[in-house]
Amino acid sequence: MSPPLYSVLLEDENSVFLLDLDLSSPMGFHAYPHLPILDSSIANWSLPFSISDETFRESKKLKRTMIPISSADFSISSSSSLSVSVNSIPRLNFRDHIRTYKRYLAAEELPEDTNSSESVVGAEEDGCADGMRLVQLLIACAEAVACRDKAHASMLLSELKSNALVFGSSFQRVASCFVQGLAERLTLIQPIGSGAGVSQSMMNIMDAASEEMEEAYRLVYETCPHIQFGHFVANSTILEAFEGESFVHVVDLGMSLGLPHGHQWRGLIHSLANRASGHGRVRRLRITAIGLCIARLQAIGDELSDYANNLGINLEFSVVQKNLENLQPEDIKVNDDEALVVNSILQLHCVVKESRGALNSVLQMIHGLSPKVLVMVEQDSSHNGPFFLGRFMESLHYYSAIFDSLDAMLPKYDTKRAKMEQFYFAEEIKNIVSCEGPLRMERHERVDQWRRRMSRAGFQAAPIKMVAQAKQWLLKNKICDGYTVVEEKGCLVLGWKSKPIVAASCWKC
């Protein structure tokens, strides 16, 4: 009698194909039955769903069906039986995070007065087992959701909800956000080929933000260095572009998601005011904010105008109430005598769609304005692949690093930490995991992909050579140990324990 098969469905938004997996052995419940069950001898996970999109497209063309391979016959170092070398598959080093979670769990389990090394080892082993089990459950649930197997997915979600604790270890906390995303995706499952729903007119998820989300975003700005790092690098680049200019103009795409008080531009105004008088002093600064929440943006503009006036800077502030996709060159008034720069902080990924048209149009429109520089800060991770399972694994790895950093900075029961995790990062995670089509706004991409997109739109990279200053900025602002800054092909990348988080880049026409 032939063994039962479980069809794992790989899907993009328009088509599907199946991989038949053997469920007759204990490997059946393992998320990837053609890989060995995880044990301490495996240093890294090689995840087949991290294969490049090109490989997936070849798979679809050939309409391959994967033959079940037992763990005893599978060798990670061998590629003779595979059409794609396993060595070419990007590795997601979840083991590094599991070791970290293991230490957290061990510390939580130990009595305060114990000095027993046996207790330490036992607690660490229990913590590792729990963490590994949670990872396996998440992946198995993601596969069930991808297969539209509501019964199996619901069963796994029930177990996950009892283990993914909002106030647990850092991995339990990030898992709770992914559980929410999987649950939402399960409820939104529709027959293949049906409509994806109506898209709201938004620039980013903050356009429809609740008060809780707005508070969480302010806390993220104050606590995490991601956005402040972007502001520091962007302002330094803008100041360099404005050197020797009397009339300057900044076009801010999204106005930093509507952060109150205009923190980035207060810093720029202060720096401009400190420049020497005479030819080096700016005679007029114009800021054009692009966004849909006109009342919020105008309030920021009023505050900035008062601040600039007190420092002797002539500021003209205006708002263009449009999203980026509908923005036209005539919407932005550009004077011939002024130096123009365009600033984009965590904005352009929201314009990335399944087709290249939307983003290309926006970039070409910006290019047509002939700015001296376009400064861009984006999340440096691949969350825009066409296949759900690939996005799921990439985002799990990325947000695990962020939640690990929060664990290092804040106590377990800190309410500010919980608000950031559940009302900001969870919203990003849910958008990546549960949404498709126009509703999926969080389409983060790696620097190399942005480099190709910018080149197609006519931009040339302008290397940012200030890695030493950026490292000094980390020290000066007493940023938590574990954050790193590296230069990567002219971009500055802020990472957590070498895992890239955000990347800043500069582009010229």
UniProtKB/Swiss-Prot annotation:
Domain of life where this protein originates: Eukaryota
Span list, region VHIID: 217-286
GO BP annotation list: arbuscular mycorrhizal association; cellular response to phosphate starvation; detection of phosphate ion; regulation of DNA-templated transcription; response to symbiotic fungus
One Gene Ontology term, aspect cellular component: nucleus
Disruption of the gene: reported phenotype: Strongly reduced number of arbuscules undergoing accelerated degeneration during root colonization by arbuscular mycorrhiza (AM) fungi (e.g. Rhizophagus irregularis).
Principal place of residence: nucleus
Pfam families for this protein: GRAS
Keywords: Nucleus, Transcription, Transcription regulation
Tissue expression: Expressed in roots under low phosphate (Pi) conditions.
Localisation: Nucleus
GRAS domain mapped to chain residues: 125-508
Positions of the UniProt region annotated as SAW: 434-508
Region (Leucine repeat I (LRI)): 132-198
Chain intervals for the UniProt region annotation (Leucine repeat II (LRII)): 299-331
Induction cue: Induced in root epidermal cells and outer cortical cells upon root colonization by arbuscular mycorrhiza (AM) fungi (e.g. Rhizophagus irregularis), especially in arbuscule-containing cells under low phosphate (Pi) conditions.
Motif position, VHIID: 248-252
Region (PFYRE): 340-431
Quaternary structure and interacting proteins, as annotated: Interacts with RAM1 and NSP2.
Protein family: Belongs to the GRAS family.
Known role: Transcription factor acting as a regulator of arbuscular mycorrhiza (AM)-related genes (e.g. PT4, STR and RAM2). Required for the morphogenesis of arbuscules upon symbiosis with AM fungi (e.g. Rhizophagus irregularis). Also involved in restricting mycorrhizal colonization of the root meristem.
Protein name, as recorded: GRAS family protein RAD1
Species, as recorded: Lotus japonicus
Gene: RAD1
